[in-house]
Amino acid sequence: MIKYIDKVKASTLAGTALLRLDFNTTDNWRMQAVLPTIKYLLKASGKIIIISHRGRPDGFDKKLSLKKDAVVLSGMVGKKVVFIDNFDFSKIKSQVAAAPKGSIFLLDNLRFLKGEEINDPELGKQLASLADMYVNDAF
């Protein structure tokens, strides 16, 4: 059942949110469009891990990294967005667990992972293990 986050009790949103966004553009209009979701989750949940993709790379491609997006998004939300440039899920879990409430993380381009485009269930499980809830605001 699909639920809208503004229709869910705030206590249900406590914890870490895995937020799927779509940054697959050359400008920032999609970032602007998702600011209300990010701000709502910051109030309601403890931490946010943002996941997204860009392009169709065959492995790592520096030009398609989301590193610059973390800087731009930091300016938009008025707080640091921690960029995570690796996909070592145990390290990511530790980093998020050690961070204070209100922290925002941005994982690098999910398309750098072979399993992203083929909807690998194991990758889905690894991503899901990072958070308490999943919020999709990719459009």
Put a short name on every predicted segment:
Residues 1-139:
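Active-site loop-to-helix "anion-binding N-cap" substructures in soluble metabolic enzymes
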